[in-house]
Amino acid sequence: MAELDRIDLKILRALADDGRLSWRDLAQKVGLSLTPTLRRVRRLEEEHYIQGYFARLDEERLSGAMSVFVSVSLEKQTGDYLARFEERIVDAPQVMSCFQMTGDADYMLRVVVKDLAAYQAFLTNTLTCIPGVAGIKSAFALKSVMLRSAPPL
């Protein structure tokens, strides 16, 4: 993998801000002609610095946007328990992100549901049905202050 230089970082920042930039506009933003810009983008894609292009959807308009942060503890932290949980949780469309954690909980989820009834249905029909789940703690977000689409570059 090649080291990222100043131009690569400019490309990544520009695409993180607007993944729909035309190649010509991107080239102009980073100060290169079209061909070298495209070559760099392809390399960044091949080396998995760019993992895809996504539309940021309005969660509130589409699903009601109740965000719930859910700490999940498992009965055991052995490989089979962890694998079983991860295999099942990735299939739940309400789960926007899932992180394995250190500390009191084994996993932290961000769940998006329409309302409290939808969250209760998620708990009873999905989360508590996963074998090995021993404890669940929920915290409801009051508002979203900010959401970044890329790490600091």
Curated annotation (Swiss-Prot):
Q: Which organism is it from?
A: Pseudomonas aeruginosa (strain ATCC 15692 / DSM 22644 / CIP 104116 / JCM 14847 / LMG 12228 / 1C / PRS 101 / PAO1)
Q: Which PANTHER family match?
A: LEUCINE-RESPONSIVE REGULATORY PROTEIN, TRANSCRIPTIONAL REGULATOR AZLB
Q: Which domain of life is it from?
A: Bacteria
Gene Ontology biological process terms from the UniProt entry: response to amino acid
Residues annotated as domain HTH asnC-type = 4-65
Its function, per the record, reads: Positive regulator of the bkd operon for branched-chain keto acid dehydrogenase complex.
Write down the Pfam families for this protein, in alphabetical order: AsnC_trans_reg, HTH_24
Q: Which InterPro entries does the entry mention?
A: ArsR-like_HTH (IPR011991), AsnC-type_HTH_dom (IPR000485), Dimeric_a/b-barrel (IPR011008), Tscrpt_reg_AsnC-like (IPR019888), Tscrpt_reg_AsnC/Lrp_C (IPR019887), WH-like_DNA-bd_sf (IPR036388), WH_DNA-bd_sf (IPR036390)
- What are the entry keywords? Activator, DNA-binding, Transcription, Transcription regulation
DNA-binding region positions on the chain: 23-42
Gene Ontology CC = cytosol
UniProt-recorded name of the protein: Bkd operon transcriptional regulator
Against Gene3D superfamilies, the record matches this protein to: 3.30.70.920, Winged helix-like DNA-binding domain superfamily/Winged helix DNA-binding domain
GO MF annotation: an example: sequence-specific DNA binding
